[in-house]
Amino acid sequence: MKYIKWFGCFAMVTLATCLTTTAQQPQEGAQKGKYLIILQAGKEGHEGMARAVHALLYTEELLKHGHQVVLVFDGAGTEWIHEWSNPATQDKLAPRYRELQKQKVTEIVCDFCAGAFQVKKDLQDRKVSLTSEFEGHPSIAKWADLGY
């Protein structure tokens, strides 16, 4: 019997809470999953920092366990990629982010939101790829169709 696992860091589910629908213990040799983690929280306040920490933490853990992970920077979350893509950043989360980059995590950055949060030009100058597949935003349906 195949169990469906759903990992939600969506704003509509609550960014700070990432859930899996099964309570079973992982089995050796179990099939690896595909996860889409969406960071929509901005840099303002303790809550935004906590959500960013957990997006990076859960991405790292899933990668270490052999799962496929796509990390999406959407909404105010584009402020984080703006900070972390700056080579001169002193942000304390930047080293963890850079480790994920070394592991070749797939990153998606919302084109529309980068503009709305006034970080688009800097991201383009830093050669950060921006995605606008559905009304200026990344397509979530595309990733769902791919099993994420």
What are these regions (language model features)?
Residues E99, F117-P138:
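A short aromatic-anchored loop/beta-hairpin motif
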Residues A30, L36-V53, I81-S85:
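Short, glycine-rich nucleotide/cofactor-binding loops
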Residues M1-G8:
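Bacterial N-terminal signal peptides that target proteins for export
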Residues A50-G66:
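Histidine-anchored nucleotide/phosphate-binding helix
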Residues T21-A23:
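Boundary at the C-terminal end of the N-terminal hydrophobic targeting segment
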Residues G8-C18:
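Bacterial N-terminal signal peptides
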Residues P87-V119:
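A glycine-rich helix N-cap at a beta->alpha junction
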